[in-house]
């Protein structure tokens, strides 16, 4: 079915007045936060909406050593990356705990493999649609040189050879 609207007519009788604050795109912010992990200096995102995925990325980024400051009122988020693999290793159990109820960990794999040479994908949560396999992600990561170091019931560990 194709919808082709060339004209939109609105008949109203009541003028609208006031102001509305519109926050940023909900699907962009978590990905922008993950991309900021690749940097070596702080990244500032503005107009950030208050979303559960922002919270999940914040927690996972902090467990990987990044510092995240988020002012919900102003919508300003500053993420300062830390490329220390020992922080992630110390927090592996918490990463597993927080990662399992979201699809966000798969987004973090690329930056983590690039910066600290290892990444863990816990068994991922999903949605009402059902299972969403990650084979195509794993195949792409293998083509970039990643190795599956461990694959068990709790998830997958990937590494980049030195």
PLM ranges: what are they?
Residues 1-162:
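Structural preference for solvent-exposed beta-strand-turn elements
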